[in-house]
């Protein structure tokens, strides 16, 4: 379920249960070395409610699914002024951080070049990542999913990729 546009359009509990049941079927069918990443988004395509609207709901799904289910953080999927570095810290602490869709945003899920609008926030996120991964003895290159999620409609994708990894 992608949520709802207005009150009364969706039964929140049924939407959660239906999504959980679907995820449980997928999780049960996974090959042994696969993981499930549950991504959340505060809005879009709907604005009244989302079935996986924040990191807490994603973590709830991941915990209900099992040890190979994790929360994926997309930097553009938060409400304005969300403390993403705190979210990263807590998910790392719980061993439930899957990885990232790296991008940036000014107005919503803009999928802009990572660090182009909020470079200091990106620094704070990486500060938590290094400290938290070191505390857990994690491999910086392999233990999380590192993905760039930028819009090819905004600028040349190769240019964006090069600027993102600089």
Where are these regions (language model features)?
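A cross-domain feature marking catalytic cores of carbohydrate-active enzymes
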Residues: 1, 38-42, 71-77, 101-104, ...
